[in-house]
């Protein structure tokens, strides 16, 4: 998903403790998709309530977000609006990949291949309107604000860092850097020992922070030139140029200065080039208000335990931590006022 700039970027290992006191914008669709993929039962299936409704996203939002709050990190979830029209081909390709994985899953089920069943199941996820609406309901009950983007969520989330209202964007996607995010936090909600898809092996995944200005300075380029590099390698809005990865694209842009010179000299065709550059430089965004409210503890129990069969003892244990954190934060605000 998105642009792959990993090979040319400086990344620093970080932790929740390192980011204590921060307000962060969360690329909601990106993170919810991660929850749906990773929070699953032993059979590889997503968590479900007694009515068969998927609840992996609710588990992720409640427990992982509570962990952020416990570390004095305040999240503002940002939800996607209408996709940019040039994203249609990417969405179509993702749909085809899911269809192929569904066919492979059916074959794995027929042959009782448990390893393949678990691996393929984790790749077949859909963020439905119900999943989005229930995510927003839970955030409201937790007293957490969310922002509705007019288009791409990572663009809105990145804009919020440019305004100085949040410290970083929580997302797996490097696209945020093209949209101007000052900092992105990767592996911030799902970390630790993680299983490698399709195998029994695990790797240790650590949170990392990527600073835009540090990387631009290190690479000796501007943000617009970083966008050029992204376009050459491929984004959600264009397929990229065959044979050009991030390192080659960087070399070309540093040699020829801009993408127009590159495509002319190399005889490359890129459709909708000006429109893509403009969208990354000046994406649409909505006005917003960031206001944190007192959690509705009874409402959370009714919603998670009453409606979705969460363990009441585990939910209450987490709510006690949220309550302590809220009271501590509220008292700190009063102390600053007086």
Swiss-Prot record:
<keyword id="KW-0255">Endonuclease</keyword>
<dbReference type="InterPro" id="IPR029060">
    <property type="entry name" value="PIN-like_dom_sf"/>
</dbReference>
<feature type="region of interest" description="N-domain">
    <location>
        <begin position="1"/>
        <end position="98"/>
    </location>
</feature>
<feature type="region of interest" description="Interaction with PCNA">
    <location>
        <begin position="330"/>
        <end position="338"/>
    </location>
</feature>
<dbReference type="InterPro" id="IPR036279">
    <property type="entry name" value="5-3_exonuclease_C_sf"/>
</dbReference>
<dbReference type="GO" id="GO:0003677">
    <property type="term" value="F:DNA binding"/>
</dbReference>
<comment type="subunit">
    <text>Interacts with PCNA. PCNA stimulates the nuclease activity without altering cleavage specificity.</text>
</comment>
<dbReference type="InterPro" id="IPR019974">
    <property type="entry name" value="XPG_CS"/>
</dbReference>
<keyword id="KW-0540">Nuclease</keyword>
<keyword id="KW-0460">Magnesium</keyword>
<dbReference type="InterPro" id="IPR023426">
    <property type="entry name" value="Flap_endonuc"/>
</dbReference>
<feature type="binding site">
    <location>
        <position position="154"/>
    </location>
    <ligand>
        <name>Mg(2+) 1</name>
    </ligand>
</feature>
<dbReference type="GO" id="GO:0006281">
    <property type="term" value="P:DNA repair"/>
</dbReference>
<comment type="similarity">
    <text>Belongs to the XPG/RAD2 endonuclease family. FEN1 subfamily.</text>
</comment>
<dbReference type="Pfam" id="PF00867">
    <property type="entry name" value="XPG_I"/>
</dbReference>
<feature type="region of interest" description="I-domain">
    <location>
        <begin position="116"/>
        <end position="257"/>
    </location>
</feature>
<feature type="binding site">
    <location>
        <position position="175"/>
    </location>
    <ligand>
        <name>Mg(2+) 2</name>
    </ligand>
</feature>
<feature type="binding site">
    <location>
        <position position="236"/>
    </location>
    <ligand>
        <name>Mg(2+) 2</name>
    </ligand>
</feature>
<keyword id="KW-0479">Metal-binding</keyword>
<dbReference type="Pfam" id="PF00752">
    <property type="entry name" value="XPG_N"/>
</dbReference>
<dbReference type="InterPro" id="IPR006085">
    <property type="entry name" value="XPG_DNA_repair_N"/>
</dbReference>
<feature type="binding site">
    <location>
        <position position="27"/>
    </location>
    <ligand>
        <name>Mg(2+) 1</name>
    </ligand>
</feature>
<dbReference type="GO" id="GO:0000287">
    <property type="term" value="F:magnesium ion binding"/>
</dbReference>
<dbReference type="GO" id="GO:0043137">
    <property type="term" value="P:DNA replication, removal of RNA primer"/>
</dbReference>
<keyword id="KW-0378">Hydrolase</keyword>
<dbReference type="GO" id="GO:0017108">
    <property type="term" value="F:5'-flap endonuclease activity"/>
</dbReference>
<dbReference type="InterPro" id="IPR008918">
    <property type="entry name" value="HhH2"/>
</dbReference>
<dbReference type="InterPro" id="IPR006086">
    <property type="entry name" value="XPG-I_dom"/>
</dbReference>
<feature type="binding site">
    <location>
        <position position="80"/>
    </location>
    <ligand>
        <name>Mg(2+) 1</name>
    </ligand>
</feature>
<dbReference type="InterPro" id="IPR006084">
    <property type="entry name" value="XPG/Rad2"/>
</dbReference>
<keyword id="KW-0227">DNA damage</keyword>
<dbReference type="GO" id="GO:0008409">
    <property type="term" value="F:5'-3' exonuclease activity"/>
</dbReference>
<dbReference type="InterPro" id="IPR019973">
    <property type="entry name" value="Flap_endonuc_arc"/>
</dbReference>
<keyword id="KW-0234">DNA repair</keyword>
<keyword id="KW-0269">Exonuclease</keyword>
<feature type="binding site">
    <location>
        <position position="152"/>
    </location>
    <ligand>
        <name>Mg(2+) 1</name>
    </ligand>
</feature>
<keyword id="KW-0235">DNA replication</keyword>
<protein>
    <recommendedName>
        <fullName>Flap endonuclease 1</fullName>
        <ecNumber>3.1.-.-</ecNumber>
    </recommendedName>
</protein>
<comment type="function">
    <text>Structure-specific nuclease with 5'-flap endonuclease and 5'-3' exonuclease activities involved in DNA replication and repair. During DNA replication, cleaves the 5'-overhanging flap structure that is generated by displacement synthesis when DNA polymerase encounters the 5'-end of a downstream Okazaki fragment. Binds the unpaired 3'-DNA end and kinks the DNA to facilitate 5' cleavage specificity. Cleaves one nucleotide into the double-stranded DNA from the junction in flap DNA, leaving a nick for ligation. Also involved in the base excision repair (BER) pathway.</text>
</comment>
<feature type="binding site">
    <location>
        <position position="173"/>
    </location>
    <ligand>
        <name>Mg(2+) 2</name>
    </ligand>
</feature>
């Amino acid at each position: 998903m998105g642009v792959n700039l990993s090979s040319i970027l400086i990344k620093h290992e970080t932790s929740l403790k390192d980011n204590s006191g921060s307000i962060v914008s969360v690329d909601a669709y990106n993170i919810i998709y991660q929850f749906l993929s990773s929070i699953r039962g032993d059979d590889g299936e997503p968590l479900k309530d007694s009515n068969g409704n998927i609840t992996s996203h609710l588990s992720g939002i409640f427990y992982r977000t509570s962990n952020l709050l416990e570390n004095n990190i305040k999240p503002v979830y940002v939800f996607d609006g209408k996709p940019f029209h040039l994203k249609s081909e990417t969405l179509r390709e993702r749909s085809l990949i899911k269809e192929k994985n569904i066919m492979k899953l059916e074959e794995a089920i027929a042959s009782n291949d448990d390893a393949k069943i678990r691996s393929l199941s984790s790749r077949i996820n859909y963020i439905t309107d119900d999943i989005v609406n229930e995510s927003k309901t839970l955030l409201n009950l937790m007293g957490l604000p969310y922002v509705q983007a007019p288009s791409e969520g990572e663009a809105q989330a990145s804009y919020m860092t440019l305004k100085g209202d949040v410290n970083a964007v929580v997302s797996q996607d490097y696209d945020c850097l093209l949209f101007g995010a000052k900092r992105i936090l990767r592996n911030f909600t799902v970390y630790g020992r993680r299983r490698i898809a399709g195998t029994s092996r695990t790797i240790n995944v650590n949170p990392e922070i990527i600073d835009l200005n540090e990387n631009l300075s290190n690479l000796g380029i501007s943000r617009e030139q970083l966008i050029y590099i992204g376009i050459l390698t491929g984004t959600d809005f264009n397929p990229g140029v065959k044979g050009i990865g991030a390192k080659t694209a960087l070399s070309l842009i540093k040699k020829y200065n801009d993408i127009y010179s590159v495509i002319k000299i190399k005889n490359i065709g890129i459709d909708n080039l000006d429109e893509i550059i403009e969208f990354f430089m000046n994406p649409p965004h909505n006005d917003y208000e960031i206001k944190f409210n007192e959690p509705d503890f009874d409402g959370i129990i009714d919603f998670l335990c009453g409606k979705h069969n969460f363990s009441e003892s585990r939910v209450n244990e987490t709510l006690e931590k949220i309550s302590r954190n809220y009271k501590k934060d509220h008292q700190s605000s009063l102390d600053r006022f007086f």
